[in-house]
Design a protein with these regions (language model features):
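N-terminal, active-site-proximal structural segment of metallo-dependent hydrolase catalytic domains
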Residues: 1-64, 75-85, 159
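Active-site metal-binding loops of divalent metal-dependent hydrolases
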Residues: 12-14, 144-146, 180-182
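Active-site environment of divalent metal-dependent phosphoester hydrolases
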Residues: 17-19, 52-58, 148-152, 183-191, ...
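A short acidic, helix-capping loop that chelates divalent metal ions and anchors anionic groups
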Residues: 17-22, 110-113, 217
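Sec-exported extracytoplasmic/periplasmic mature domains
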Residues: 40-44, 61-65, 166-170, 195-199
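Structured beta-strand-rich core segments of catalytic domains in phosphoester-bond hydrolases
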Residues: 46-142, 146
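Active site of divalent-metal-dependent phosphoester/diester hydrolases
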Residues: 69-92, 107-111, 118-122, 171-173, ...
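His/acidic metal-ligating clusters that form di-metal
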Residues: 124-142, 151-194, 207
């Protein structure tokens, strides 16, 4: 894609309640309208969200209405309806349409409900092939939420994602976006892997968007409900 083929994408951890005592303003019921407002006002064509529980998904779909589509599948494949956390991809319908949507697991059996050996929960990645109406072309978007405890599980997750990127590109090469909540610091091994040219994935070349923006525009993605 060249400089004229610009689109806006954002990654947004919506923060589930977890049943812990929270300040009232931190509860999802108090934040949902603001979250939907932020998505609308961002002007983003594609939004990757994390920690999206089924009740939150219903709220987001209702508040964004027909202007957006919320796409993806839960990490428990619907087996646990109340806690089936999603890492969905949201698209703005007047600017994009989805030709393919798929969710896979970040484990050694990524096509089946499973988890990495050291991971507390199953972790997933949602991938979508999205046609951009204004540009007349398609891109592929991966959205994920890596394990919050175990570095080994995060590293495995990145390897699984890169493997899927390579296989998808062998079938049909497309410009690709990877976004999500990596639960990792900039110098950590999972992030370094994404910066490196890995011998086992010779066809994958990723650019860190933080390297393309002014330092004043770089912010920590851990927002702590502060904006």
């Amino acid at each position: 894609m060249n400089g004229n083929d610009l689109i806006r994408v954002i990654s947004f951890n919506l923060k589930r309640d977890f049943g812990l005592p929270l300040n009232r303003s931190h509860k999802w019921s108090e934040r949902r309208a603001l979250a939907a407002q932020y998505i609308r006002e961002s002007g983003a064509t594609i939004i990757g969200v994390q920690e999206l529980l089924p009740n939150m998904r219903e709220d987001v779909s209702r508040l964004l209405d027909v202007d957006y589509s919320v796409l993806g599948f839960g990490r428990y494949s619907g087996i646990r309806p109340q806690s089936d956390e999603h890492s969905d991809i949201i698209i703005k319908n007047d600017s994009a349409k989805v030709n393919l949507i798929k969710t896979f697991w970040l484990s050694k059996e990524p096509e089946h409900l499973s988890r990495a050996y050291y991971a507390i929960f199953p972790r997933i990645c949602t991938v979508a092939e999205i046609y951009l109406k204004d540009l007349g072309r398609s891109i592929r978007v991966f959205n994920t939420h890596l394990d919050h405890i175990c570095g080994i599980a995060r590293t495995l997750g990145i390897r699984v994602i890169l493997g899927y990127m390579e296989r998808f590109n062998e079938e049909r090469a497309l410009p690709t976006v990877l976004m999500g909540d990596f639960n990792a610091k900039p110098g950590s091994r999972p992030v370094r892997m994404l910066h490196s040219q890995l011998e086992e994935f010779p066809g994958i070349h990723l650019t860190d968007v933080y390297s393309r923006v002014e330092p004043s525009e770089v912010h920590n993605t851990l927002h702590n409900f502060s904006g």
